[in-house]
Design a protein with these regions (language model features):
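Active-site-proximal alpha-helical scaffold in enzymes
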Residues: 124-140, 158-166, 223-235
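An extended, acidic, His-containing surface patch that forms the Zn2+-binding/catalytic region
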Residues: 158, 186-187, 244-315, 319-323, ...
Length: 465
């Protein structure tokens, strides 16, 4: 039996495997689901064994959440492919009523598979294991060696991952990296991501007094920290121009003419973007004038206020608030320096504070951008595999998000090519209510990865770069 035939005959089993994974509430963001994280790692190991992987184990480093690991090293002389996915997910708290079906019950509807983690990133676990099983259950061997790692703390920043890689370098060393944690620009259009934005996150705290004061006594006299904070944050408003942060564009790498033309061909027109992101009628897209959405989200810096707090609804009172805070996330692009960008934003936020309030700005997280040249033997192999799996030639795209380990891991592996293959699409709603995975693309990606093993295994002299 051919691997493709095996995938067709075992489609229901693969969907069932995904259903089992989605059913485990492996939420890593709140510290209250450690048992579920452990259970999900164990379940992933069980699925690895069923697919035919060897040396399967739950691994940890320090106080990390569990990793699931398995390997098959029965192809001497052939390249080794490192597969990455993650089994932890985002919570649904506060948005349960917006789900049209139970978030932790995989539900097929309108050609899509709904459930928390279906797209991000449990679907990737099943596509990778399905591709592995399609060979090991039919040919009893793979065209390449495979090492597979499924992480348990991606959704909380992967703080232990780099240390885990260094600690287990010899065990993990591979020739090609394959990550399925990015998106496709459209349903049915396979995409290879060759750039990722980085991130600079910071906290701003504004203080005006040592204690709250009754607004009847001090309202109109005492500086309101919440208003002062919002006056400061308003300095970041860009309208339809560039970000009003001096120096922030100085090192931004310009798009080539080829990139600009390619980006404008992908992803549709404004009505599609508005529909995909649920933009309300009458609300403008906040684009810089004459900049295409793909260019804006893939290769331009952006600034977002992700948390703002001064009090709570439950604790509301007629007081002048003495303290307010916000967290700001800035996405950075090639060739920006995270430390420089932090200082540039800090300078804007701390200059001439309203009413002379005390302003403190501190860094909370930084992650470098990543970019590679999407050519060379491994990228040719991926292009062929995706074209065979999807029936459409793939396109090369950027990603507005961040996957911080890709660059350091490629470097640790001696400059290994990193293939970032899309599993999500514009309406997957990762992290949001009604997260879903397109069932057809799920099957096509599984077939593509199966074929990718063959394409890499057939590279002349095993040269992957």
């Amino acid at each position: 039996m051919q691997p493709t035939k095996w995938l067709e005959e075992n489609d229901a089993n693969l969907i069932n495997d995904l259903s089992k994974l989605v059913g485990v509430q492996s939420i890593s963001t709140d510290g209250a689901h450690q048992k579920e994280l452990d259970d999900c790692a164990e379940l992933t190991c069980t699925l690895m064994k069923s697919a035919g992987l060897n040396n399967v184990a739950v691994l940890k480093t320090g106080n990390s959440n569990p990793y699931a690991y398995g390997e098959w090293l029965g192809a001497p002389g052939k390249p080794t492919v490192f597969l990455y996915a993650h089994h932890d997910v985002q919570p649904v708290m506060g948005f349960e009523s917006q789900w049209q079906s139970p978030p932790f019950t995989l539900t097929e509807r309108d050609g899509r598979l709904f459930g928390r983690g279906a797209a991000d990133d449990k679907g990737a676990i099943v596509t990778q294991l399905g591709a592995i099983a399609s060979y090991l259950q039919t040919k009893k061997e793979l065209p390449v060696n495979v090492k597979m790692l499924v992480e348990g703390e991606e959704e909380v920043g992967s703080s232990n991952l780099q240390g885990f890689f260094v600690e287990n370098k010899d065990r993990l060393m591979s020739d090609v990296i394959v990550v399925c944690d990015t998106g496709n620009a459209e349903v049915g259009l396979p995409c290879i991501t060759y750039s990722l934005r980085g991130i600079v996150e910071l906290k701003i705290t504004v203080k005006s007094a040592t204690t709250p004061v009754h607004s009847g006594s001090a309202g109109g006299m005492l500086a309101d920290a919440a208003i002062a904070l919002n006056v400061i944050l308003a300095r970041l408003y860009w309208g339809h121009k560039k970000l009003p942060v001096p120096g922030i564009y100085d090192k931004v790498r310009k798009l080539t003419g080829t990139e600009k033309r390619a980006f404008r061909k992908i992803g549709g027109e404004e009505p599609k973007w508005r529909s995909d992101f649920g933009v309300l009628d009458g609300v403008e897209l906040a684009l810089e004038s004459k900049v295409h959405p793909n260019e804006a989200t893939w290769r331009k810096p952006s600034i977002t206020v992700i948390v703002e707090a001064a009090s709570s609804v439950a604790g509301k009172s007629n007081q002048v608030l003495p303290e307010a805070l916000a967290y700001i996330s800035c996405r950075i692009v090639p060739d920006q320096d995270p430390a420089e960008v932090f200082e540039q934003i800090k300078a804007v936020l701390t200059k001439d504070p309203p009413w002379g309030v005390k302003v403190e700005v501190t860094p909370t997280a930084q992650m470098k951008w990543w970019m590679t040249d999407p050519t060379g033997p491994s990228f040719v192999a991926a292009t062929k595999a995706l074209k065979k799996g999807f029936g459409v030639k793939p396109v090369n795209i950027g990603c507005g998000g961040s996957i911080g380990f890709v660059g350091p891991l490629a470097e640790l592996f001696g400059g290994a090519p990193a293939l970032l293959l899309g599993i999500e699409d514009p309406i997957s709603n990762a992290h949001a209510p009604n997260e879903s995975l397109h069932a057809g693309d799920f099957r096509k990606l599984t077939a593509s990865i199966s074929n990718l093993f063959e394409q890499i295994g057939n590279l002349p002299d095993g040269k992957v770069k």
